[in-house]
Swiss-Prot record:
DNA binds at residues 90, 109, 151. It catalyses: Hydrolysis of DNA containing ring-opened 7-methylguanine residues, releasing 2,6-diamino-4-hydroxy-5-(N-methyl)formamidopyrimidine; 2'-deoxyribonucleotide-(2'-deoxyribose 5'-phosphate)-2'-deoxyribonucleotide-DNA = a 3'-end 2'-deoxyribonucleotide-(2,3-dehydro-2,3-deoxyribose 5'-phosphate)-DNA + a 5'-end 5'-phospho-2'-deoxyribonucleoside-DNA + H(+). It comes from the Bacteria. Binds 1 zinc ion per subunit. GO terms for biological process: base-excision repair. This is Formamidopyrimidine-DNA glycosylase. SMART domains: Fapy_DNA_glyco, H2TH. The active site is at 2 (schiff-base intermediate with dna), 3 (proton donor), 57 (proton donor), 260 (proton donor). InterPro entries: DNA_glyclase/AP_lyase_DNA-bd, DNA_glyclase_Znf_dom_DNA_BS, Formamido-pyr_DNA_Glyclase, FPG_cat, MutM-like_N-ter, Ribosomal_uS13-like_H2TH, Znf_DNA_glyclase/AP_lyase, Znf_FPG/IleRS. A zinc finger (FPG-type) spans 236-270. One of its GO terms (molecular function) is damaged DNA binding. Belongs to the FPG family. It comes from Shewanella pealeana (strain ATCC 700345 / ANG-SQ1). Involved in base excision repair of DNA damaged by oxidation or by mutagenic agents. Acts as a DNA glycosylase that recognizes and removes damaged bases. Has a preference for oxidized purines, such as 7,8-dihydro-8-oxoguanine (8-oxoG). Has AP (apurinic/apyrimidinic) lyase activity and introduces nicks in the DNA strand. Cleaves the DNA backbone by beta-delta elimination to generate a single-strand break at the site of the removed base with both 3'- and 5'-phosphates.
Amino acid sequence: MPELPEVEVTRQGVSPYLIDNTVTDLIVRNPSLRWPVPEIAKQIIGQTIRNVRRRAKYLLIDTDAGTTIVHLGMSGSLRILPATTPAEKHDHIDLVLASGKALRFNDPRRFGAWLWCELPEQAHPLLSKLGPEPLTDAFNAPYLLESLANKKKAIKLCLMDNHIVVGVGNIYANEALFAAGIHPQAEAGKVDAERIEILVSEVKQILAGAIKQGGTTLKDFTNADGKPGYFAQKLHVYGRGGKTCTQCGHMLSEIKLGQRATVFCSLCQQR
């Protein structure tokens, strides 16, 4: 599933082709995504794209008339192609531009979304209750310590809670907790301030590193020019259950936590 770095890499890749370009058509081949593509989404036709932003794992395409909200779901990707390129299987939507290019949305599993918002996007139900962005100053140790106070849930589940901090999905939660030496099942409210400070720092470093490497490609993700991300080559725990710890050589444990694969080193990561 594309996480924050993958969505940010996509934003960086498509932005130069979209900003200041006028939309000439919106071709919807299959509206049956996670939510049906609304007919109102075609209000973008004739509009000039003013900006392309990211909020959590959502891509926001701004025009004067409103904002297109795109979510890549489990297997979605966006690519810039000549508008005349024949559509292939799972190419569900084309945003056609006056430049002769098109932003093409491909989603084999159809868990993604293509929506339209005329209100300030902060008021949209999908965006209104999101926590701070992890790469901003708003996500800091005092904030996280206060947010976790008295919480009995596992720290990993809290780290993946978009109401607390956005965009830290399963891959990067596993990696950040390993780097910080925190057991993923540790009770969130009992993790001390020193380790929370380390965790915040590691979350920021790991996400920034993943963006620099073009995201993590495990199966479906490619960036806007069709190339894979290379951060998978730097993963220490995610997807490595039963293999040796890169730090101490002990065998990595794998469990299910919140129905998600969770890999950790029982020696390096203490409760």
